[in-house]
Amino acid sequence: MKVTVERAQLLKSLGHVHRVVERRNTIPILGNVLVRAESTRLSLKATDLDLEVTETLAAEAATAGSTTVPAHMFYDIVRKLPEGAQIVLEGDGDRSVLAIRAGRSRFTLQTLPENDFPDLAAGEMTHSFTLAAADMKRLIDRTQFAISTEETRYYLNGIYLHSAGTAKAATLRAVATDGHRLAQIDLTLPKGAVGMPGVIVPRKTVGEVQRLIEDNEAEVGIELSQGKIRFTIGNVVLTSKLIDGTFPDYGRVIPQNNDKELIVDKKDFEAAVDRVSTISSERGRAVKLALSPGKLVLSVTNPDSGSATEELEVEYASDPLDIGFNSRYLLDIAAQIEGEVAVLKLADPGSPTLVQDKDSKGALYVLMPMRV
């Protein structure tokens, strides 16, 4: 194998694929990236057995071929080479090394046989559709914060993607919850997604797709089956196993009859919660909301350091109510509100609260209260 490639393109592509590779691997080949040269292109592939990323870039191959090299070392070498450099990659099968040349710099990396590199065979994909990159990014950005990190509740360690609604108003819905808060985003169901199975996309996969979308303004191709999902974003193809579990019946925790409505300026509310929570302890993080007609008083009391209160003018016309929330969770949800006004629908101090964007009907959030 002998191939010439521009440093900027190689660095960008390696930046995408090497993130999949774990720093420590008990299986040596999983620490490597598969490099394959073919006439006018170079492809890079990395996997952790659950997730596989392949990217293709322009190159000039004098000799076609393929090999595998340590992913993070390869990335670091390319990153430190001078900008604008033309990089020559040349494999020496007899010595099991890959030579890397750029200007006066010379490196050799030990290789492992390509035949040992695992292939995450996707099999037949039953559904295929496309989303605008901005829509895919919104689905992820507005739900990712609520993904559970508890490994014992593995079925909550991702975003539940499924079709919902009625035939006349069918939606593609993304839901995430950690048991304390829930996020739900709806988009118009794209062609090809009708009848799709409900799938749980793992947290790591979600993060990689999010980063890839930030580099691309085009469309995202999505193919899925019961066991795997594939995202095509520009020259990158990401294939992932799905979480093998049953997502809970989240509809049961979404309040339907909360009769107390609080309407508040999103920026003022977010800033006030942030200010008063400065004094809260890391362990407690509770902020109290005292509601009365036209007024909201936010307060935090920390026995070790003191207290804080702030008053806001709001739209509220129901009976007085005191309720507590985890301040970090409250700030996370407030950050998702895209418009200028947030609407909180409450019932009592022990029941979940529904949070919505006044200007956007496609998103809703649920937050469980805390005792204060």
Can you say where each PLM-predicted feature lies in the sequence?
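Structural preference for solvent-exposed beta-strand-turn elements
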Residues: M1-V372
